[in-house]
Amino acid sequence: MARTNGTRATLDAVAAAAGVSKATVSKVLNGRPGVSGETRERVREAMRRVGYAPTTGPRDPAPAGTVQVVFDTLTNPYALHVLGGVLAGADELGAEVVTSVLRPDGGARVRPPGPAWLEQLSARGRAGLILVTSELTAEEITACHRLGLGLVVVDPLNPLDESLVSVGATNWAGGVQATEHLLSLGHRRIGYASGQDRSVPARERLHGYREALESAGVRPDPELVRFEAFAPDAGRRMTEALLDLAEPPTAVFAGSDSIAMGVLAAARGRRLRVPGDLSVVGFDDTFGTLWTDPPLTTVHQPLRDMGRVALRTTLQLARGETPDSHHVQLATRLLVRGSTAPPRRR
């Protein structure tokens, strides 16, 4: 069979014959991950049909591959803990990591991923993609599957296709643990201040909070539930609104440590003592919680382990393997420190 002249034209011919992109053909030629076994064989068969013969042998692939990690923002300790876990996992497995940030300064998103950007990642030989607290459209999910990019989502902001692989913590159980601790101290007016109400972790923690209240015979009060953002400023604003209620809470369960920092700031602004006048529980156990005044009681979630698991699972998907679980949830545990105490009698 006659060959098409030129390497670029030949790649076009192979891609057309196999029904895949040129980026996928390039991955097969160079021994890179990110292509299923079935697709890899289809490309090889197309190469035989069009008479393609590489002029050079395949390049030595990286031991594991290169993974793109996309963060919504890196301006909070949570993201840095997850990144630390991803990097540790990459070092253990011999992979490489490239990071992208959608909101570099924590403000409005400046660069949505989009299918075209995903095409560029595939062409650059990325084995897969890890998204941390970021949103995906159906079009972007389809593009990842089409390009053979292993895709794992850590703490998704929005409910996703059940077929997607996600990594998180036992948020519901953590919400129960935090609220039960406050109830055991005698609190009954317990506020919940969290991030975006569409956030999967925020909703799961809310459900745990409500479950603990109802199990204790305490009727959940919608006035005590606030959503805004996982940020200190938002935590301060939400707490001020809670403290302005006719019957303010004696304790606040913050949906993240960053929010808890804002809760503490609001308490200082009102000259309220923590925990004498207001008890506070955070969620994450990020660095700095031991150094607040007082040290913050918080729900520990294994953020570094979440990063490690996400990296390992992405590489599994890139190799065409079935992951151990489609929805990984790592255990949380309550760490009692100095920011919680029985409520003051009024």
Residue ranges and their predicted role:
Residues 1-6, 65-180:
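Alpha-helical recognition/docking segments in bacterial nutrient-uptake
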Residues 4, 241, 245-346:
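Flexible loop/turn connectors
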Residues 24-27, 59-82, 181, 189-196:
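Short beta-strand segments enriched in small/hydrophobic residues
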Residues 123-133, 191-193, 225, 246-256, ...:
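Periplasmic-binding protein-like
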